[in-house]
Amino acid sequence: MKDMGKKITGALGLLAATTLVAGTVVAPEGVSAQQQDQVPPAAPALEWDPNDPRIGLGAGWLDAESAISGMELLAAIPRPDGFFNPSTPADGRFSNTDLAFQDGLLIQGNYNGFQIYDISNPADPTLSVSVVCPGGQGDVSVYGDLIVMSAQETRGRLDCGVEGVADSISAERMRGVRIFDVSDMNNPTQVAAIQSCRGSHTHTIVTDPADTENIYVYIQGTSRVRPGDELPGCSGGGPEDPETALFRIEVVKVPLANPSAAEIVNMPRIFADEQGNLAGLWQGGNHGPGTQSSRLTNQCHDITAYPGIGLAGGACSGNGILLDISDPVNPTRVAEVSDPNFAYWHSATFNNDGDVVVFTDEWGGGSAPRCRATDPATWGANAIFRIGEDGQMELAGYYKLPVPQTETENCVAHNGSIIPVPGRDIMAQAWYQGGVSLMDFTDPENPFEIAFFDRGPLSIESLFTGGYWSVYWFNGRLYGAEISRGIDVFRLTPSEHLSAAEIAAAESVMINEFNAQLQPKVEWAPS
């Protein structure tokens, strides 16, 4: 890898980029976006450095050109056999999804199951075991001897079989969360399969400091409601139907001593208003001339729990919300915001102090090019909110990838985590084929990029879904889950934006486990 201003050409370079496109940045002042009845100014146009080395990178699958600044690529591990289609590398049935970490292990989720890698030497990850278990998305979390995995597709089977389910109604179908016993990491065993009406697009492990015998799993379902003939009690009715499977999440209680007894213990109506209307938040549609059309709030895409502050951030289609999780079985909404620049609220990340939260907008669903020159700087971006002493959120600024991407690169804000640099708020983030971007939001009104890595598109002729699903910091290194290419490992390097001492302080923070949706509170040892 070479530093900013230079590119690297892949050894097999099959395709060459032809068109320079433009990108984004900036935290505009005066855009007060959280009030639903407010008509904001027009979204600002994109701004970028025309000399940015990410512009014009050559295309390819494993041989694309790349550009890097403030980081060093230590390892690039292709997806193993059984987790990609050699004839169609972008085959979505084998996409890499989210990551989880425990000690010297990395768990890589995939639409076709999951893999466990030994990362005791981060520069040389080695595959320990693969578990084939189709059903998508395959997002994973780890806690002690348990791995939890989301399943939402109708092809998912209770027995993890690869043959799928042909019948429209079947007792063999699995849509919900799977729990695997990994006390023997070389022989993961499914011990529970908790069915839910909409399946599990994502899930969140929630812990209770006062309860060491159980963990809780919040199920976020975004797919269609399955028939009641397949799972009794499932209804796809509107908010007037008290039994509807919409407008809720599910809470699963998992006894650590007997995880096979895991069960749904609550289905809280976290969008209800004071009158009990289940559809109490954003009703869907645009916010006025020149604004986004935001989805109806009847689901959460992601919930990030931060037990250290007793809150969770919910990215819930048409709203961003805060939940009081002091009682994990009964989360209650304490704040909500909407934003006329957001199409679909996707994920949330708190700063370490818990007084700022970053929400992402997955405009285009993650499969569309949304980082082009013609795309507004506040659409498909991060919105950064201060959390006041009263617990309410106030918009501070926006951040979007500050570089243009092409028409054949799916690109929008996606998953990331905090890098624990003392005294600063820094987030590493995936932008699909926009690559990796490190955002400094210590001043929430003026966020800016401090490091990046990007590859050229998979193709300059056609748009194939690829790029980074997630990028997370774990014990001194950054790990990126690349949808179509595999796993990348980075270390930070000193730059004008980040000193060697700051990097060393971040690298000194060691934790046993990391799930991005269960955010830990970091404390640094006295220097």
Q: What feature does the model see in each segment?
A:
Residues 3-31:
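Secretory targeting and sorting signals
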Residues 34-527:
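Feature marking well-ordered beta-strand scaffolds used for ligand recognition
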